[in-house]
Amino acid sequence: MSYKCISLDEARMLLDNPDTVIVDIRDSQSYEDGNIPESINISNNNIDQFLEKTDRDVNLLVYCYVGNSSKGASEYFVQNGFKTVFSLDGGYEEYALN
């Protein structure tokens, strides 16, 4: 099982799906300054709680600043049992431009 890197256009279909959990792995200040609606800001401080309470069968869309760190985070989520994990190419920067 592995994650898939997807474009913003592909991600938009997931954003409309109620079974999608959106994870923002940027720092909390960047998250506060702007984020994808309905996203959850995940850090080392709350990752354990997120793993405990989140169903492994959801669609998990992970994003960061420009799409690099989200790949490592996506792999981490796969290793922790999530079945359908996506990393947003271009990250929040791409989302904010469009």
What is each residue range found by the language model?
Residues 1-20, 27-59, 65-98:
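Rhodanese-like catalytic fold shared by cysteine-dependent sulfurtransferases
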